[in-house]
A protein has these predicted regions:
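Signature of N-terminal electron-transfer/Fe-S-associated modules in redox systems
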Residues: 2-169
């Protein structure tokens, strides 16, 4: 079955725009299509559309969606009127591309204590949306966020011999 979805997309390009602007669109997608199909469609329709092709992380109607779930599931949850915006407005460089440079320092601290595998680094960046959930992350520029603490908890499980050093971070 097909779903017709009315979109309100909050777009922004740090190089050109002072403030975000809204683009409205209507799309028709199969309910079995994953959310990534919507982003691929928008990429083909919109000039210079920016999003992470490897990791879906977006706010739909003010709710964080960080998994590539089906359009049908999302329609059940959000209806057929979606407001799409970056999960990290202050760190957004272009549309849905988030500047992660500020996270290199906390990740380097962990690397100084124990090796970080490519799978562990992938986990770190999958937890990225959780770095922006608390008001602290909005007000303290050096605060790595709750995502970093979730990552540390996982690293402690995977590297118990360095647990005490990791807990000091």
């Amino acid at each position: 079955m097909q779903e017709q979805i009315q979109l309100e997309i909050l777009r922004f390009d740090i190089k050109k725009d002072y403030l975000p602007y809204t683009h409205k669109d209507i799309v028709i997608l199969e309910e079995t299509n994953p959310l990534s199909e919507l982003f691929a469609l928008l990429d083909s329709r919109l000039l210079h559309f920016g999003y992470n092709k490897h990791r879906i992380q977006v706010k739909i109607n003010d709710v964080l969606v960080h998994q590539d779930v089906s359009v049908g599931m999302l329609c059940e949850r959000f209806g057929r009127h979606w407001r799409l915006e970056s999960f990290a407005p202050k760190a957004t460089a272009h549309d849905f591309l988030v500047n992660t440079d500020f996270l290199s320092a906390p990740l380097a601290l962990v690397r100084n204590i124990c090796p970080v595998s490519s799978e562990e680094e992938e986990l770190f960046f999958n937890l990225l949306p959780f770095c922006f959930l608390s008001p602290l992350s909005q007000n303290l520029p050096d605060y790595a966020g709750e995502g970093f603490f979730l990552f540390l908890a996982e690293m402690i499980k995977m590297h118990p011999q360095q647990a005490s050093e990791l807990m000091r971070l």
